[in-house]
């Protein structure tokens, strides 16, 4: 009886696997036009260097590529003009002087054809871009960043020395 149950279960799993191997593995899993919002979705997955624009059916409309030595810095926005503004960081960050949650390093503007129009890097011993940024109506970018303050400066500004971890303070700045 146990063999019959095992065989039946194995057959069901095999059939389910065959059905899944033919389904779309990227994009939309379920689509109800009555519940969907018109437009596209920008996807910038963590630890993958590319950003994808998909339609409501999950079909890829456009891809912006980055080299394999880069990883997302947690933010990407599409402008009304079709420019992609995204943040990224080196894939290997262990040697970076500042590393904390939400770490970025570069904010970059790219055209629809993936040409870099501009970039801004903050990733040194005094500061590192944080996880997000905002585009203003004037076309400028506001970004939050980690700021390293050494113990002498922190104490001079009123910080309790007992609360300084590793002899420094990480603050934030715009």
Residue spans of the language-model regions?
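Histidine-/acidic-rich catalytic cores in large beta-rich domains
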Residues: 20-174
């Amino acid at each position: 009886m146990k063999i019959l149950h095992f065989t039946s279960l194995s057959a069901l799993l095999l059939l389910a696997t065959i059905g899944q191997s033919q389904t779309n593995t990227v994009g939309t899993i379920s689509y109800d036009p009555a519940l969907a919002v018109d437009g596209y979705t920008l996807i910038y997955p963590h630890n993958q260097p590319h950003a994808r624009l998909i339609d409501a059916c999950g079909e890829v409309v456009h891809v912006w590529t980055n080299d394999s030595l880069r990883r997302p810095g947690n933010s990407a926005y599409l402008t009304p003009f079709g420019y992609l503004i995204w943040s990224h960081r080196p894939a290997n960050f262990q040697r970076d002087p500042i590393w904390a949650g939400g770490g970025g390093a570069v904010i970059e503007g790219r055209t629809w054809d993936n040409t870099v129009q501009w970039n801004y890097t903050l990733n040194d011993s005094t500061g590192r871009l944080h996880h997000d940024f905002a585009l203003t109506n004037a076309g400028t970018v506001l970004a939050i960043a980690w700021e390293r303050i050494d113990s002498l400066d922190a104490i001079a500004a009123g910080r309790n020395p007992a609360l300084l971890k590793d002899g420094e303070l990480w603050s934030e700045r715009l």
